[in-house]
Swiss-Prot record:
Component of LSM protein complexes, which are involved in RNA processing. Component of the cytoplasmic LSM1-LSM7 complex which is involved in mRNA degradation by promoting decapping and leading to accurate 5'-3' mRNA decay. The cytoplasmic LSM1-LSM7 complex regulates developmental gene expression by the decapping of specific development-related transcripts. Component of the nuclear LSM2-LSM8 complex which is involved splicing nuclear mRNAs. This is Sm-like protein LSM5. Expressed in roots, leaves, stems, flowers and siliques. It comes from Arabidopsis thaliana (Mouse-ear cress). Residues 9-84 form the Sm domain. Keywords: Acetylation, Cytoplasm, mRNA processing, mRNA splicing, Nucleus, Ribonucleoprotein, RNA-binding, Spliceosome, Stress response. The keyword Ribonucleoprotein applies. Its main location: cytoplasm. It comes from the Eukaryota. InterPro entries: LSm5, LSM_dom_sf, Sm, Sm_dom_euk/arc. It is found in: Cytoplasm; Nucleus. Component of the heptameric LSM1-LSM7 complex that forms a seven-membered ring structure with a donut shape. The LSM subunits are arranged in the order LSM1, LSM2, LSM3, LSM6, LSM5, LSM7 and LSM4. Component of the heptameric LSM2-LSM8 complex that forms a seven-membered ring structure with a donut shape. The LSM subunits are arranged in the order LSM8, LSM2, LSM3, LSM6, LSM5, LSM7 and LSM4. LSM2 subunit interacts only with its two neighboring subunits, LSM6A or LSM6B and LSM7.
């Protein structure tokens, strides 16, 4: 396995994030930050200690969840260690 992150396969990079905080930007108006517990070949993911950010007509709604299963088809971007506040 390569040590240089630019030479990693996407699945290897995601695998290195297991047990760490990850920022998941979904298709649509939802973003989630949580601890990645696992994923499969379809990039379906299990996150724990999750904060969900949703953009609504009233503004940004924040929801705390113990655990969530995400469908990989709805994931647009993964940011290891990041969160929406990092961009503000």
């Amino acid at each position: 396995m390569a040590n240089n992150p630019s030479q990693l396969l996407p699945s290897e990079l995601i695998d290195r994030c297991i047990g760490s905080k990850i920022w998941v930007i979904m298709k649509g108006d939802k973003e989630l930050v949580g601890i990645l517990k696992g994923f499969d070949v379809y990039v379906n993911m299990v996150l724990e200690d999750v904060t969900e950010y949703e953009i609504t007509a009233e503004g940004r709604r924040v929801t705390k969840l113990d655990q969530i299963l995400l469908n990989g088809n709805n994931i647009a971007i993964l940011v290891p260690g990041g969160s929406p506040e990092d961009g503000e």
